[in-house]
């Protein structure tokens, strides 16, 4: 039996209510893009120095929280699922006060 290959981004969706009041799924990247569009429009021409870190923290913290719940705190399994070294995971957990 052949397994169907899915792009990891296919599964990262956000449920939204469309103009016909129907719930649909859209890629997470679309929500991130909209959030950035909103943020940049509020800057009113001002520069910002830490946008990358700001966006990364907004995504990374809840991702780490959810993966640690999913793995029931198993850091080795969580690191494997994230595709990072366990030491790197421990640093990130410490950064967000999660470990």
Swiss-Prot record:
It comes from the Bacteria. GO terms for molecular function: DNA-binding transcription factor activity; sequence-specific DNA binding. Pfam families: HTH_8. The keyword Transcription applies. Gene3D superfamilies: Homeodomain-like (1.10.10.60). Residues 1-24 are annotated as: Disordered. Coiled coil: none annotated. Residues 75-94 bind DNA. Keywords: Activator, DNA-binding, Transcription, Transcription regulation. Activates ribosomal RNA transcription. Plays a direct role in upstream activation of rRNA promoters. PANTHER family: DNA-BINDING PROTEIN FIS. Belongs to the transcriptional regulatory Fis family. Homodimer. This is DNA-binding protein Fis.
């Amino acid at each position: 039996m052949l397994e169907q290959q899915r792009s990891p981004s296919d599964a990262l969706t956000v449920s939204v209510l469309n103009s016909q009041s129907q719930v649909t799924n859209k890629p997470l990247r679309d929500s991130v893009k909209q959030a950035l569009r909103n943020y940049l429009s509020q800057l009113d021409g001002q520069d910002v120095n830490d946008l990358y870190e700001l966006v990364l923290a907004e995504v990374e913290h809840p991702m780490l929280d959810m993966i640690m719940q999913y793995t029931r705190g198993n850091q080795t399994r969580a690191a494997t699922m994230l595709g990072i070294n366990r030491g790197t995971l421990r640093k990130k957990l410490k950064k967000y006060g999660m470990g």
